[in-house]
UniProtKB/Swiss-Prot annotation:
Gene name tied to this protein: proB
Pathway terms, separated by semicolons: Amino-acid biosynthesis; L-proline biosynthesis; L-glutamate 5-semialdehyde from L-glutamate: step 1/2
PUA domain segment(s): 275-355
PANTHER family listed in its UniProt record: GLUTAMATE 5-KINASE (PTHR43654), ISOPENTENYL PHOSPHATE KINASE (PTHR43654:SF1)
Record's protein name: Glutamate 5-kinase
InterPro entries: AceGlu_kinase-like_sf, Asp/Glu/Uridylate_kinase, G5K_ProB, Glu/AcGlu_kinase, Glu_5kinase, Glu_5kinase/COase_Synthase, Glutamate_5-kinase_CS, PUA
E.C. no: 2.7.2.11
HAMAP family named among the record's database cross-references: ProB
Length: 369
């Protein structure tokens, strides 16, 4: 079995009728495929949209609401109804499901990140299928992941999945918009996510985007940098999930980095919030970015910001101004200032295990999304 642990992301369009309401037949089809994969020995996580679609009708709305409060209320009702559909269908095959609602704070806060990771690990080891969504009924903008594509990538990275599958209304990434460009071709294998790939997906200055593809490329960057390959394929075929797991479905495959980021490094790269800035000399910059060394106090040129022991700071090359990465400091700002002023700077500010270098792909993620 090539892909034992798989995260599937199913969007609203794959779960709803033409009027925007929840399609029970589509939910049933998804759960049947999950059951077959589960019985074959796969460990599965489903990141599912559809809470608003499941709930707005029950509250008397004639169509999907647009006001935030109405959508949150619909999600509050619909999340339970959606989970009931999944649970009922899975229990018919003696499979236990579990609901987990997450916000961005569950990834940013180191303790909550660890707790979520542990809970998911127990569920998977016990044979349950976690069904995950963002906590749309209460989340505010500051704590939003923003979309379930990104959420699914964050979850896949957290649990070190073997594959992340996006089921969408487009069967992969195309060189152009296949709906309007007859010359558009599907890319079957993407080795590196770069500016060209972002433009194909609908980046700035491009009109090629289809199927919310840009957010999927953002998500694919998080996943592949964390060592998780990504598959984008159509949800329109009846056995699309099974075929994706077996790599027989038509789609676009994004290759994972050989040395994917460990959980601690993922947190540093994607979620840890910087409390200050450090500028280093050329020697320290090379030691960090090229040789994987710790950051010595002797290589520090300048420090800025209010930070304490154990906080995260961003490190820059003083000569080029380039951001090198982020790390956890062994001294607070005041203590560091005293050390630098004394000109007796000996010791380590950031150990290599508490450091993450910013690769071109990760830098692109920060600047383009």
């Amino acid at each position: 079995m090539k892909y034992k642990r798989i995260v599937f992301k199913v969007g609203t369009s794959s779960l709803t009728n033409e009027d925007g309401s929840l399609s029970r037949s589509k939910v049933k089809d998804i759960t049947q495929q999950l059951a077959m994969l589960h019985e074959a020995g796969h460990e599965l996580i489903l990141v599912s949209s559809g809470a608003i679609a499941a709930g707005f009708g029950a509250l008397g709305f004639k169509k999907r609401p647009t006001k935030i409060a109405d959508k949150q209320a619909s999600a509050a009702v619909g999340q339970g109804l959606l989970l009931e559909e999944y649970t009922t269908n899975l229990l018919l095959r003696q499979i236990v499901s579990a609901q987990i609602l997450l916000t961005q704070d569950d990834f940013v806060d180191k303790r909550r990140y660890k707790n979520a990771h542990q809970a998911l690990s127990v569920l998977l080891n016990r044979g349950a299928i976690p069904i995950i969504n963002e906590n749309d009924s209460v989340v505010i903008d500051e704590l939003k992941v923003g979309d379930n594509d990104t959420l699914s990538a964050q979850v896949a990275a957290m649990v070190q999945a073997d594959l992340l599958v996006f089921l969408t209304d487009v069967d992969g990434l195309y060189t152009g918009n296949p709906n309007s460009d007859p010359r558009a071709k599907r890319l079957e294998r993407i080795e590196t996510i770069n500016r060209e790939i972002i433009d194909m997906a609908g980046g700035a200055g491009s009109s090629n985007g289809t199927g919310g593809m840009l957010t999927k490329i953002k998500a694919a960057t998080i996943a592949t940098e964390s060592g998780v390959p990504v598959y984008i394929c159509s949800s329109l075929k009846s056995d699309s999930m099974i075929e994706a797991a077996e790599e027989t479905e038509d789609g676009s495959y994004f290759v994972a980095q050989e040395k994917g980021l460990r959980t601690q490094k993922q947190w540093l790269a994607f979620y840890a919030q910087s409390q200050g800035s450090i500028w280093v000399d050329k020697g320290a910059a090379e030691a960090l970015s090229q040789h994987g060394k710790s950051l010595l106090l002797s290589g520090i040129v300048e420090a800025e910001g209010v930070f304490s022991y154990g906080d995260i700071v961003t490190v820059f090359d003083k000569e080029s101004g380039k951001s090198l990465g982020k790390g956890r400091v062994q001294f607070g700002a005041s203590a560091l200032e005293d050390i630098l002023r004394s000109q007796k700077a000996k010791g380590v500010l950031i150990y290599r295990d508490d450091w993450i270098s910013i690769t071109p792909e990760i830098q692109l993620l920060f600047t383009e999304f």
